Amino acid sequence: MATCGEVLVKLLEGYGVEQVFGIPGVHTVELYRGLARSSIRHVTPRHEQGAGFMADGYARVSGKPGVCFIITGPGMTNITTAMGQAYADSIPMLVISSVQSRNQLGGGRGKLHELPNQSALVGGVAAFSHTLMSAAELPGVLARAFALFQAGRPRPVHIEIPLDVLVEDVDALLASTPVSISRAGAAPSAVEQMTAMLASAKRPLILAGGGALDAAAELTELAECLGAPVALTINAKGMLPSRHPLLIGSTQSLVATRALVAEADVVLAIGTELAETDYDITFAGGFEIPGALLRIDIDPDQTVRNYPPRLALVADARTAARALLDGLNAQPLAERCGDWGPARAARLRADLEGGWDAATRAQTLFLDSVLQALPDAVFVGDSTQPVYTGNLTFNLERPRRWFNSSTGYGTLGYALPAAIGAWLGGKDLGHGRPAVVCLIGDGGLQFTLPELASAVEARTPVIVLLWNNQGYEEIKKYMVNRAIEPVGVDIYTPDFIGVAKALGCAAEAIDGVAQLHAALLAACDRQGPTLIEIDQANWMTQVSK
């Protein structure tokens, strides 16, 4: 006899799932039947929010959906924040939960873990939520989820399985096989029109986002063909290498970059929703695209949001970029206007770098020092000062090396569990498994501090760089700037070194660049996590000497 839970595990294996994140509970034990005999590794967080963040980090690095097993009720309310972050950033996540038996759904009888409507609860943070009313539906609904991940705009999917369905005898479903879907190609007529507009442009510019991560090579070739400066969103860092002459970084919120965008006569936006946290991080407004806007996105709805285009193409970013290249290579291009291209991009970069203040320079030195010690590291960030700085000043050599929760939903506590997931997904990055660095502040770390124990247990050697500024400094600045007397921001901070060591984690505090470099190299030799604490005030003093 094979139960629904056992068939689920078999089907997940067939879809290439290698990791599952979850906390077993009385309602989910049947999800685990057969898991020990499978090839799937299970990682246990200390909170379901941690499971979701781990799945998120795993997906961002590996490109595969992160999968969670979650218990009815409190498990689902706990994971919704992580689903919200993944939804906002278009991250593939499969959340499989239990739910009350079919004859008790919505009954309001006070059953253990009961919610009036669990599926409705997560409806706003999931592409869809499906209640499995029969085990026979399982292959079809999994196929629907993976079709979305493979060919649509990837976002969290929730499948809830009633307790009585989980134990159904479904031997016949053992023969079920995965379904593979390819992304849509580019419509030839739209490609022709878009190619003609790009070919006639005298000042073309490209805005590329996380939706184009897998098109890095094509994007680079397209930019070089057009001589177009390229601005990347925060999650798209590394799509052009850091020293590429056409790269203008992720500085779309700054006046000088906005002026360059305003000069462009044709702007190609590919895989980006043109949203506030990438194009207006100071919330000042004023990002304008007066030139002809061309948009490429896998989601038709997204092509007309925020900034309506002159022309839109609904297609996979890589396929569309290749089609445009083929068209551009077959026709003459308009002469570029003045110094537009590498020279104009270089002038902008020089202007920006000359304007960084002392704090920005000190935090950029911190990030550069980490990268010098760990050249191919993956940086997983929280909402914290060095991350805000790096979002503006930091560029990397390859994609999927920089992402954080300061974009989109903007939650705190993300970075530590997401870094655990990122390390587990890192084996698929090539160039050997890279080091994974968690950038997090003292306030954010206290949201998910117990996940250090998860990292120890899972033997994931993540390097936690704790930037300690003694509370919620960014919010304190907002209060002061608005003439509000600061309240609730000067929080108590514990002995992080002592807590980390008590959880089984190596930990130390450092002063200056030399100690940071030595601590990072020592961390790379360990089999488990390391916490390195950097006191903000002390760092500023040390590097200014």
Outline where the language-model segments fall.
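N-terminal alpha/beta PP-like core and its mobile active-site loop of ThDP/TPP-dependent enzymes
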Residues: M1-P332, S369, R433, P461-V464
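Thiamine diphosphate
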Residues: Q104-H113, V261, V304-N306, A312-V314, ...
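Basic phosphate/pyrophosphate-binding loop/patch that engages nucleotide-derived ligands
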Residues: A151, L374-P375, V456-P461
